[in-house]
Regions:
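Conserved acidic residues
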Residues: 19, 101-103, 136
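Membrane-embedded segments
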Residues: 1-58
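Conserved beta-sheet core of the metallophosphoesterase superfamily
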Residues: 13, 22-23, 111-195
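Solvent-exposed loop/turn segments at secondary-structure junctions
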Residues: 1, 27-31, 65-67, 81-84, ...
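Active-site beta-strand termini and strand-to-loop segments that position acidic
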Residues: 68-70, 168-169, 198
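Binuclear metal-dependent hydrolase catalytic cores centered on His/Asp/Glu-rich metal-binding motifs
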Residues: 33-57, 61-64, 69-107, 111-114, ...
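N-terminal post-signal-peptidase region of extra-cytosolic proteins
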Residues: 6-8, 61-62, 87-92, 152-160
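Residues at the C-termini of beta-strands that transition into short coil/loop
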Residues: 25, 63, 80, 177, ...
């Protein structure tokens, strides 16, 4: 919801990166949880997108961008939300990326990651004759690592890929605990900003 973003706009607008700041929408960026008429919900969703663009962020809505570094480049792809509400289109986000390129996928909910493995991506998302490149690295959030962890037990521990680094068929997923949460409390589950260095 745009109202949840508003108090942090000034701070988030100060984020800068040499190759730009990229983002995707998560389930709370839509009006799925808002008790309002459809026109009000649509306006709120449009305002959230407008706010991210005004902050100078590259909001990836089932699309990709190319980041160049000298003679090398990587693709940064991003999907919309997978469920509640379901707007993700993996094929659209990856379409046009040729095999042999490194793909970094931004995806709020991590549960669909296994369907993007090299052995499954074209079966699940590809059209006949189409070759989609499996992302080598996917970054997700959504679970907040359960927000509460007691002796390693957390509410999300049985959810697929709820926290940490996972590997499958040479591709990796990292699900972060992030900074926010459903309620403003964390016990034994620290908020985090993760730095990943690509070499």
């Amino acid at each position: 919801r745009q109202s949840e973003l508003k108090p942090y706009v000034r701070m988030l607008s100060s984020l800068r990166a040499k190759d730009g700041v990229y983002s995707v929408l998560g389930n709370h960026d839509y009006s799925y949880y808002v008790n309002a008429d459809s026109l009000t919900c649509l306006r709120q969703e449009q305002e959230t997108r407008r706010q991210e663009w005004q902050m100078g962020w590259h909001l990836l809505l089932n699309e990709h961008a190319v980041v160049h570094r000298g003679s090398d480049s990587i693709y940064v792809a991003g999907t919309e939300n997978f469920k509640k509400p379901a707007h993700a289109n993996v094929a659209k986000a990856l379409r046009g990326i040729r095999p042999g390129h490194f793909v970094l996928m931004l995806q709020h909910i991590p549960t669909q990651w296994e369907d993007m493995a090299p052995s499954r991506i074209n079966l699940v998302y590809g059209r006949k004759g189409e070759v989609l490149v499996a992302p080598q690295l996917t970054l997700s959030g959504h679970t907040h690592a359960g927000q509460i962890s007691v002796f390693g037990l957390r509410p999300t521990m049985f959810a697929p890929y709820d926290y940490g680094l996972y590997e499958r068929e040479g591709c990796q997923l990292f699900t972060t605990a992030g900074l926010g949460g459903v309620v403003p409390i964390r016990v034994g589950s620290t908020a985090e900003i993760v730095v990943i260095t690509l070499k």
